[in-house]
A protein has these predicted regions:
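Bacterial N-terminal signal peptides that target proteins for export
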Residues: 1-14
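Bacterial signal peptide processing site
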Residues: 25-27
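Soluble non-cytosolic domains of exported or imported proteins
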Residues: 38, 112-116, 199, 203-207
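C-terminal motif of bacterial Sec signal peptides marking the signal peptidase cleavage site
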Residues: 20-23
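Conserved polar/disulfide-associated segments of primarily extracytoplasmic proteins
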Residues: 54-179
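Post-signal peptide N-terminal segment of mature Sec-exported envelope proteins
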Residues: 31-53
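Surface-exposed amphipathic alpha-helical segments
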Residues: 47-49, 187-222
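A short, solvent-exposed beta-edge/loop patch
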Residues: 182-186
Length: 222
């Protein structure tokens, strides 16, 4: 007469099967790193990389020049099914898109970077720049309003600013950008990061976006 399997044996088999399933599951996050400049970001694995050459072209950079030659490292990721630099810099992004970068600062420019200059790296965020943009009929940025602004001093001489703001570009729908900019101790390196999408997207996916923002880490060289 055949006997049924003992409960502990059945449980052991189920646990073994579960471990196999866990082991086969893909990673939950993609880790974006620039080890030489000790810069790190974590994005959901569903966010796909944006073609670096497409980012360069969107910024008007020479796509044939290597990052090391121009002193600029950039990486973009997009939660949209069709990753595009338009979702970083265009009028609208229905899903979160993020850009992370490190730029060498020329010796002649190292004394010119104030916190307001960091705030204004992508859009006219500082009060004075907002006033200038409002008075300029050719400005493509409209209805910019700062939601939060925080000066950052994480240590090791690194300093910067974290700003979240609403805005519209070229008459497009309202967007939200969450940006963090840092300078290292001697202002020889500029570290940049932002994630943006529509206001509806930002509200619906705020936890996901906040996790990405909080993962952005810059460490001064030892």
């Amino acid at each position: 007469m055949a006997h049924g399997r003992k409960p502990w044996a059945l449980l052991s088999s189920l646990l073994a099967a579960l471990m196999v399933l866990v082991g086969c599951a893909g990673p939950e996050y993609t880790y974006v790193t620039n080890s030489s400049d000790r810069t790190y970001l974590k994005v959901p694995n569903s966010w796909r990389p944006i073609d670096p050459k497409a980012i360069d072209a969107a910024l008007g950079l020479d796509t044939t020049v290597k990052d090391s030659e121009r002193g600029l490292w950039l990486q973009g990721y997009d939660a949209d099914a069709s990753p595009s630099p338009d979702h970083l810099f265009g009028a609208s992004a229905a899903a979160p898109a993020t850009l992370i970068g490190v730029q060498d600062v020329p010796m002649s420019a190292r004394g010119s970077y104030s916190l307001d200059k960091l705030r204004d790296l992508f859009y006219p965020v500082s009060p004075s720049s907002q006033q200038q943009a409002a008075a300029d009929p050719t400005s493509v940025v409209q209805d910019l309003s700062v939601m939060s602004d925080e000066v950052l001093t994480p240590g090791d001489g690194v300093r910067g600013v974290h700003t979240v703001f609403r805005y519209r570009v070229a008459g497009g729908p309202p967007q939200v950008m969450d940006q963090t900019l840092y300078l290292n101790d001697d202002a020889s390196k500029l570290y940049l990061f932002f994630v943006r999408c529509s206001t509806e997207c930002y509200q619906q996916r705020q936890k996901e976006i906040t996790n990405v923002v909080s993962s952005f880490t810059v460490l001064e060289k030892l």
